[in-house]
Amino acid sequence: MTTMSTGQSEGTWSITTRVIVYAAIGAALYAVFNWTTFAIQIPGTQNVSIRPHFGLVTFFGFAFGPVAGFLVGFVGNTVGDQLAYGSAFGSWWWSVANGLAGLVAGLFPVWMASRMTTLSSRAMTSAVAGVVGTIVGFLFIWIELIIQPELGFNTILTGEYIPTILGNSIAAAIVTPILVYAWEPLREQLGR
């Protein structure tokens, strides 16, 4: 039985044509969905939007490795910010946080390979990977305490971090396993 991680045969941190192609597809999808949903804000937050498509970041990391996951999150969020706000790097730390979430989710198939022997176990692991990736990756936004100290700890915690990890964790826990269930038969047909 095969595993979902392309990192098993190519190396976890390999940057191959395949990784770049999958990352480009994922980043393009993520950017377009970011652009289409940026106006749907969670009330009482610091411009945190509802993003059910966040599961794309964790899926691409889980399915294609940590490099692809990072690129989908970072590039997709950067391009999405440019499309939505006209400023690709105005909040670069959010793009890095999105990338780190995909990277962390991409490490789970390496760490858990021996436990993912069935499609259902891979799907369940992908949900956990998505939630853990979100919680860990978005810790990076705390750099705002240095960059924008006027926001303060409480605003970052209650207006940004908690709403972001709640919304994105829900999306990752639902969307990532659905995409794993959809991708696995295609992957086997393609011989990937």
Task: Name every feature range the model reports, one short phrase each.
Residues 1-9, 185-192:
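Short, charged juxtamembrane terminal tails flanking transmembrane helices
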Residues 2-63, 67-68:
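Hydrophobic transmembrane alpha-helices
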Residues 26-34, 76, 80, 101, ...:
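Alpha-helical transmembrane segments of multipass membrane proteins
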Residues 38-54, 85-93, 111-192:
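Membrane-embedded alpha-helical hairpins and interfacial helices in multi-pass inner-membrane proteins
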Residues 42-43, 57-59, 73-77, 177:
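Re-entrant/interfacial helical elements at transmembrane boundaries that shape
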Residues 53-57, 97-102:
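Hydrophobic core segments of transmembrane alpha-helices in multi-pass, intramembrane catalytic enzymes
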Residues 64-65, 76-86:
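Interfacial segments of multi-pass membrane proteins
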Residues 69-78, 126-133:
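Central hydrophobic cores of alpha-helical transmembrane segments
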